[in-house]
Amino acid sequence: MNKQLLTLFPTPIITVEIPKELSVACNYLDSIPQKDNGSSATYGTYSENTYVMNAPECKELGDFILKCVGDYGRNILGYDYDEYAFSQTWVSWKQPGQMHHNHTHPNSLISAVFFYGEREENTPAITFTKQFAVANCSYIQPLMVKDRKDIPTAWSSFSINYNPGLLIIFPSYLSH
């Protein structure tokens, strides 16, 4: 029997290691004021400034990230744009057990997460989730096998562990 798996419309995510010389921007990121939205026990804190990549201290890092985003847009997603710009950039600080709520970024095409700082035990990963309530999805939810680790096409979530210096680039519609 001759069979072929066709993985139609995959969702590409790329990871890039930031060059060590760009990590000097992390000193600035650590120095900016934090804000608490009232649920810091579960959510953590975030920067008061939601345009941190506009700071002169972040110029080289921001330029590197935008170059990576441009390469991803053109060569992975097939987008036809001459340049990209940040819509917003902020820092989110999490302790073990804290996490973002699941969300997308509807005001942009491409999103990125940059991990920096020290790795601690139980530092939360970023988890991407498959959206079931979308077009072309059966209203009948199937009974899934319990162990799907060897069946990537059946995964409903995928996590990337915290790794300082790692940049993760993905389509903004991807829930995370």
Q: Which functions belong to the PLM regions below?
A:
Residues 8, 83, 104-108:
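A generic structural micro-feature
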Residues 1-79, 99, 125:
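Non-heme Fe(II)/2-oxoglutarate
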Residues 92-169:
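Catalytic core of non-heme Fe(II) oxygenases with the double-stranded beta-helix
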Residues 10-12, 87, 108-110:
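Residues at beta-strand starts and edge strands
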Residues 78-89:
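A short coil-to-beta-strand element that immediately follows conserved catalytic motifs
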